Amino acid sequence: MILSFHTSCFAGTTEEIASLLLFVEQSGCTFIRNGKHYDAPEARKHIAKKYNYFKDRIHTAEEFIHYSATKSTMSGQPYRVVCNGEGMTSSDWLLAELDKVRTTILEEDHETPDNNTDD
């Protein structure tokens, strides 16, 4: 039973991380890393590369954000993102998206075929 729960949590984390990477890639936002600007697909590549490097330390989506998408390992400077003219830290932006992902998953888990009123 415990193994099943652990596996289920890992699967959920893997899905959340994949969802966040896709969100970054499709965002159309500009990412600022160490003063340089990168488009969304390039940012996704960089975050995925860091994720692969830190994978053994990452057990939650929050740890994924912390290790892979928060700040430069070299300079310590926080990553920033600019979407529609508004800037924020990439950490705040991704944590907000993670909340949306989890809310969507919870809503989908509570829907059942018996509740379908289209008949």
Segments predicted by a language model, with ranges:
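Compact alpha-helical subdomains of small soluble proteins
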Residues: G35-D119
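N-terminal secretory signal peptides
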Residues: A11-Y53
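Sec-dependent signal peptide recognition
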Residues: M1-I2
